[in-house]
């Protein structure tokens, strides 16, 4: 950018309006996140879920509000190029001592991209690259606190850490829980290492709230070694607080931040500091995913796309059609060297799909608003993104021209995708089952049924439950990822197939009963799910009841009664009540 900061009053006023718009957004966002502590203390799980859902819309509301202001007060869509360059420079100046500069830059981009033509989507007019460093931004309270076990010993230090969170609900037996923490840590380490002179426990200032759990996240620094840890705090059966477990493996802590789970509620003045700390204990977790899981989805998208552009500059493979059975609604492609898939809504759907583009987009938004309980892959939604045309395989280009011609345009050497979704790439479950051993088939089918159960009690009916619509993660977890037919459980009518009036009708292969658009007959699932003898054997062993209306009706009733189920992002054998049987079990409502 060759422009210099000038005294253009319009540019200054627009920059000021943009900063005001962002600050209002983050003030509302942070206020909602801060209330998670109150919901946890009160055990108001429904309010917690509602807050996570409502928070998804905050960003777009403030962007639209700011766009309207700029258009009404400044005729922003008719400003000359020099003024827009001045706007960016004045905006940068306003961020020098800002606590969330990276988020503000993304907000600037979101507003600018709604006003400017996409030919302006470069670093002269928007933030294609960050302008303000997020290193060493000071905050009060600080991002993390440090505790020194030399002062009173490790046990007393752990107590001080927990008590500093100042939850307005007493612990059931904190001495017992600290004893469990010490025993679990010793079992993990094998023996206590010698305490070095720099030994300290660093703990993020805010707890991480999700569902019915508050997580304390930190690390022990001892000499040259770092030991990450996470404490899960829940309500006990007595109504008081208990420590449910301690997670000590970095990969298990990473699972907490899986995009298949609901976003955390965290009170952060300097979110970049939280991300930097989390990266120190999960170095393989992309920053884009960490921002997303902290509820900052637009920042996650910004960082993801910057990472993608950088990857494209340093690779030469081509985008290809994703392996697996082709979908009726989505055209899916991938870049083999990058662990994601790109999903475009087709212009014409398969004959069995009675829906339109708006319905599909609404279903994908629904996924962001619900508790995904570790069983639905999150998506990143993009519009008007330019990718190198030369990187698209000819077969994929032909598919795009045939199935989704309105979804893209070619502009010089770029292919511009008008609207698409991105998800983490997984092995389709149907492909996994084809290649799996008998034991692996049994494990995958067991996981598949568990995924359906957990979605159902979280008020999600998958709709199309074919194996191809589920994927297997690198940890062997089965996750649903095809959302065009999902519905709320409470909207469905689960029925038993009525008896045929006479035998000939039953043998005809034609249905003898009427069905409304929301009617579901679980007995029919076996017809399209259990063709393989290996799959049928495993399914009937673990999930026979999924073929009966009673399971679905009971799950439906639980949702209607306001029951909020317990979902644990760690195995039962890590819970203190299982590791140390004398420990009381945390409440399961």
Swiss-Prot record:
One of its GO terms (cellular component) is cytoplasm. It is found in: Cytoplasm. Its main location: cytoplasm. The keyword Cytoplasm applies. It catalyses: L-seryl-[isocitrate dehydrogenase] + ATP = O-phospho-L-seryl-[isocitrate dehydrogenase] + ADP + H(+). Its EC number is 2.7.11.5, 3.1.3.-. GO terms for biological process: glucose metabolic process; glyoxylate cycle; tricarboxylic acid cycle. Keywords: ATP-binding, Cytoplasm, Glyoxylate bypass, Hydrolase, Kinase, Nucleotide-binding, Protein phosphatase, Serine/threonine-protein kinase, Transferase, Tricarboxylic acid cycle. ATP binds at residues 322-328, 343. InterPro entries: AceK_kinase, AceK_regulatory, Isocitrate_DH_AceK. The active site is at 378. One of its GO terms (molecular function) is [isocitrate dehydrogenase (NADP+)] kinase activity. The keyword ATP-binding applies. Belongs to the AceK family. Bifunctional enzyme which can phosphorylate or dephosphorylate isocitrate dehydrogenase (IDH) on a specific serine residue. This is a regulatory mechanism which enables bacteria to bypass the Krebs cycle via the glyoxylate shunt in response to the source of carbon. When bacteria are grown on glucose, IDH is fully active and unphosphorylated, but when grown on acetate or ethanol, the activity of IDH declines drastically concomitant with its phosphorylation. This is Isocitrate dehydrogenase kinase/phosphatase. It comes from Azoarcus sp. (strain BH72).
């Amino acid at each position: 950018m060759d422009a210099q900061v000038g005294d253009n009053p319009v540019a200054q006023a627009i920059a000021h309006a943009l900063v005001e718009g962002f600050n209002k957004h983050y003030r509302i966002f942070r206020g909602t996140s801060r209330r998670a502590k109150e919901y946890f203390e009160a055990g108001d799980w429904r309010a917690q879920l509602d807050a996570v859902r409502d928070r998804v819309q905050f960003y777009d509301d403030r962007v639209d509000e700011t766009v309207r202001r700029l258009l009404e007060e400044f005729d922003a869509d008719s400003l000359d190029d020099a003024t827009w360059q001045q706007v960016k420079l004045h905006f940068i100046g306003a961020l020098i001592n800002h606590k969330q500069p990276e988020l503000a830059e993304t907000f600037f981009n979101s507003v600018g991209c709604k006003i400017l033509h996409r030919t302006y989507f470069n670093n002269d007019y928007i933030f294609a690259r960050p302008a303000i460093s997020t290193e060493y931004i000071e905050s009060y309270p600080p991002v993390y606190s440090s505790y020194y076990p030399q002062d009173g010993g490790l046990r007393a230090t752990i107590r001080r850490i927990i008590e500093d969170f100042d939850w307005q609900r007493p612990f059931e037996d904190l001495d017992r829980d600290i004893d469990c923490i010490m025993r679990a840590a010793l079992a993990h380490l094998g023996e206590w290492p010698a305490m070095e002179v720099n030994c300290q426990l660093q703990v993020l200032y805010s707890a991480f709230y999700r569902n019915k759990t508050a997580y304390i996240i930190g690390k022990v620094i001892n000499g040259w070694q770092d030991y990450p840890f996470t404490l899960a705090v829940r309500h006990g059966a007595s109504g008081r607080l208990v420590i449910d477990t301690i997670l000590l493996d970095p990969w298990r802590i990473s699972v907490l931040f899986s995009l298949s789970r609901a976003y955390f509620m965290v009170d952060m003045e300097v979110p970049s500091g939280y991300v930097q700390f989390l990266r120190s204990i999960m170095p393989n977790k992309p920053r884009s995913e960490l921002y997303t899981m902290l509820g900052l989805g637009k920042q996650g998208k910004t960082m993801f796309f910057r990472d993608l552009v950088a990857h494209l500059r340093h690779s030469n493979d081509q985008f290809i059609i994703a392996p697996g059975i082709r979908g009726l609604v989505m055209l899916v492609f991938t870049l083999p060297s990058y662990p994601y898939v790109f999903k475009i809504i087709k212009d014409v759907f398969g004959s069995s799909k009675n829906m339109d583009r708006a319905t599909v987009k609404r279903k994908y938004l629904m996924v962001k608003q619900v508790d995904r309980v570790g069983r639905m892959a999150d998506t990143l939604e993009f519009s008007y993104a330019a990718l190198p045309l030369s990187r698209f395989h000819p077969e994929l280009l032909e598919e795009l021209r045939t199935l989704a011609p309105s979804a893209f345009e070619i502009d010089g050497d770029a292919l511009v995708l008008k609207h698409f979704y991105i998800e983490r790439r997984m092995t389709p479950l149907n492909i996994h089952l084809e290649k799996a051993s008998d034991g692996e088939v049994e494990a995958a089918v067991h996981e598949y049924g568990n995924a359906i159960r957990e979605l159902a009690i979280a008020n999600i009916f998958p709709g199309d439950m074919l194996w191809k619509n589920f994927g297997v993660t690198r940890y062997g977890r089965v996750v649903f990822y095809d959302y065009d037919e999902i519905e709320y459980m409470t909207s469905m009518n689960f029925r038993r197939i009525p008896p045929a009036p006479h035998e000939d009708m039953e043998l005809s292969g034609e249905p003898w009963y009427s069905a409304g658009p929301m009617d579901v007959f679980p007995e029919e699932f076996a017809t399209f799910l259990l063709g393989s003898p290996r799959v049928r054997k495993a399914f009937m062993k673990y999930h026979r009841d999924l073929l009966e209306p009673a399971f679905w009706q009971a799950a439906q009733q639980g949702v209607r009664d306001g029951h909020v189920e317990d979902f644990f992002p760690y195995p039962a054998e890590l819970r203190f009540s299982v590791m140390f049987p004398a420990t009381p079990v945390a409440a399961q409502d």
